[in-house]
Amino acid sequence: MAAATDGGGLPLLADKAASHSHHHHPERHFTSGEVVRDVIMGVSDGLTVPFALAAGLSGASAPSSLVLTAGLAEVAAGAISMGLGGYLAAKSEADHYQREMKREQEEIIAVPDTEAAEIGEIMSQYGLEPHEYGPVVDGLRRNPQAWLDFMMRFELGLEKPDPKRAIQSALTIALSYVIGGLVPLLPYMFISTAQNAMLTSVGVTLVALLFFGYIKGRFTGNRPFLSAVQTAIIGALASAAAYGMAKAVQTR
């Protein structure tokens, strides 16, 4: 069905806009995807790895003090390692963006007509005709910086990274890992018997995994309850494997 138009052939959107203002539809978007990804990565590994380590040591009949010492050492090492990994990943992403931007800038200067034609190809993918995107192409050619930004985003699919992203990513992942890693170790700080501490750690950590999985599902758009169950199962399997392996080695 054709849209109603005015004398100039443009769709009449005024009534729609007015109606929309009266029937506002709240859009639920979360734009800080990189931060959420870092937190998920840090907390997820922080909950799982020390949990599995503590279960394995408990299975080997290690005392609570040893489990706690080894667990804290692992949390410190894991936080540093994951933080550095996040820093290097973000730094590599920023370096890649700079290289591609330099190459694209050189192409705009060397072969402007070819690059302008690529704008048209991109626009045509959205259903626009040459007479519709022609003025856009002309406007971008008059503004080299806007042209470069357009090509980076729509041709290469690259967003300009935040200059502080590498440091922020490292700190976010490391801190999240520490927070997650302390959860399964808390019982060992207060319970002297390793077996009792392990059972308490299992209960506390599984609750934390369920809660974290639910929150993760809410932020990532997945089904929260399914995400909670999946996260808890992964943590439980990791700790069970470590505990079983320790018991198997101990009996040899």
Swiss-Prot record:
Residues 1-38, 87-170, 218-224 are cytoplasmic. It is a multi-pass membrane protein. One of its GO terms (molecular function) is metal ion binding. It is found in: Vacuole membrane. Keywords: Ion transport, Iron, Iron transport, Membrane, Metal-binding, Transmembrane, Transmembrane helix, Transport, Vacuole. Residues 60-65, 192-196, 246-252 are vacuolar. GO terms for biological process: intracellular iron ion homeostasis; intracellular manganese ion homeostasis. InterPro entries: Ccc1_fam (IPR008217). Residues 92-167 are annotated as: Cytoplasmic metal binding domain (MBD). Fe cation 3 binds at residues 107, 115, 118. Can mediate sequestration of iron ions into vacuoles when expressed in the yeast ccc1 mutant. Can mediate zinc ions sequestration into vacuoles when expressed in the yeast zrc1 mutant. Belongs to the CCC1 family. Homodimer. The dimeric interaction is mediated by both the transmembrane domains (TMDs) and the cytoplasmic metal binding domain (MBD). This is Vacuolar iron transporter 1. It comes from Oryza sativa subsp. japonica (Rice).
